[in-house]
Every structure is written in structure tokens, then in C-alpha cells.
Amino acid sequence: MKNVTDSFVSLGHWPSAGSFGFNTDILATNLINLSVVLGVLIFFGKGVLSDLLDNRKQRILNTIRNSEELREGAIEQLEKARARLRKVEIEADEFRVNGYSEIEREKLNLIDSTYKTLEQLENYKNETINFEQQKASNQVRQRVFQQALQGALGTLNSCLNNELHLRTISANIGILAAMKQITD
């Protein structure tokens, strides 16, 4: 803090340069030197500065032109993308509609196929039942026939004695002899 106050105090001790005013001595103020330097700078620097500004202007114009071309290309790509999107949406709607109708058609085909399969299974079941019924009735008939035959044989065996047996044989021989005489 002391250094700050000392610097203000030392400012107060500087010798005064004089009063404020214009110095009219041209050589003392270096106006000629300044004007010569400015003239040389303007004369030689004008071309360089002009070239720099022209180059900068061309770069800016090229950048703007490129930006416009990119913008137009982006707009064109956006329109193409929108057209593709519309086309894809239309195709998706067609696929959706066709898909639903295809699903319905497949569903109906599946139902028809299932009904036909069930009908075939029902027919096969009925044929199997009829076959089994015929087989069972044939077995019953065969069984009844065998039992009747066994019963008849049992009756014949119990009824037949030797005398009846000999008479039956004699009667059959007589029938055969009569048939032979008719045929001769």
C-alpha cells in the first residue's frame, strides 16, 4: 500500500512540461515524416490491401456459392427422401392391405383344410367302425354256426345208434342207386 501512495507522491514532483497548446513547428512535430510514411504506405499498400480484400471477397463469394449449392443439393435430397418416404408409405399400406387379405385368405384356406381333414377323419372313423362291426358280426355268426354245428353233432351223436346209422347208410345207398339208374 505504501508503494502505491509513493508513486502518487512522485508524480507530483515531475517537472511540468508546460502549458497545453499546438506546436506549429512542422519539423518539430514530424508532420512531413508522417505524411511521407502515410503516402508510401498508401501508394504501395493500396495494391496489397486491394489484393487481400479481393481475395477475401472471392473466398466469401465462393463460400456463399458453395453454401447455396449445398443448400440446393440438400433441398433436392430432402425432396427425393420425401418422395421415397411417400412411396414407401404407399407400398406399406398396400402390403398392409394385401397382408390382411392374404391373412384372411390363408385363414379361410386353413379352416377349409381343417374341415376337410376332420371330414376325412370322420369318414375313416365311420369306415373303421363299420369294418369292426362287420368283423364282430362275422365272428358272432361264425361262433353261432360253430355252436349250432357242435350242438347238431352232439344231437346226432346222442341220437344215432348203430341201427339208425345203418338205416341211414342203406337209405342213402338206395338213393344213389336210383340216381344211377336214372342217369344210365
UniProtKB/Swiss-Prot annotation:
Which stretches are transmembrane?
27-49
Q: What membrane topology does the UniProt entry give?
A: Single-pass membrane protein
Question: Lineage from the top down?
Answer: Eukaryota, Viridiplantae, Streptophyta, Embryophyta, Tracheophyta
What is the gene name?
atpF
**Superkingdom of source:** Eukaryota
What is the organism of origin for this protein?
A: Guizotia abyssinica (Niger)
Q: How does it assemble?
A: F-type ATPases have 2 components, F(1) - the catalytic core - and F(0) - the membrane proton channel. F(1) has five subunits: alpha(3), beta(3), gamma(1), delta(1), epsilon(1). F(0) has four main subunits: a(1), b(1), b'(1) and c(10-14). The alpha and beta chains form an alternating ring which encloses part of the gamma chain. F(1) is attached to F(0) by a central stalk formed by the gamma and epsilon chains, while a peripheral stalk is formed by the delta, b and b' chains.
What keywords does the record list, in alphabetical order? Answer: ATP synthesis, CF(0), Chloroplast, Hydrogen ion transport, Ion transport, Membrane, Plastid, Thylakoid, Transmembrane, Transmembrane helix, Transport
**Reported function:** F(1)F(0) ATP synthase produces ATP from ADP in the presence of a proton or sodium gradient. F-type ATPases consist of two structural domains, F(1) containing the extramembraneous catalytic core and F(0) containing the membrane proton channel, linked together by a central stalk and a peripheral stalk. During catalysis, ATP synthesis in the catalytic domain of F(1) is coupled via a rotary mechanism of the central stalk subunits to proton translocation. Component of the F(0) channel, it forms part of the peripheral stalk, linking F(1) to F(0).
S-S bonds: none
User: What's the main place this protein lives?
Assistant: plastid
Entries under InterPro entries matching the protein: ATP_synth_b/b'su_bac/chlpt
Additional remark text: In plastids the F-type ATPase is also known as CF(1)CF(0).
Question: What name has this protein been given in UniProt?
Answer: ATP synthase subunit b, chloroplastic
Query: In its keyword annotation, does this UniProt entry include Aminoacyl-tRNA synthetase?
Result: no
A single Pfam family it belongs to is ATP-synt_B
A GO term for molecular function = proton-transporting ATP synthase activity, rotational mechanism
UniProt-annotated location(s): Plastid, Chloroplast thylakoid membrane
The family this protein is said to belong to: Belongs to the ATPase B chain family.
Show the GO cellular component annotation of the record. chloroplast thylakoid membrane; proton-transporting ATP synthase complex
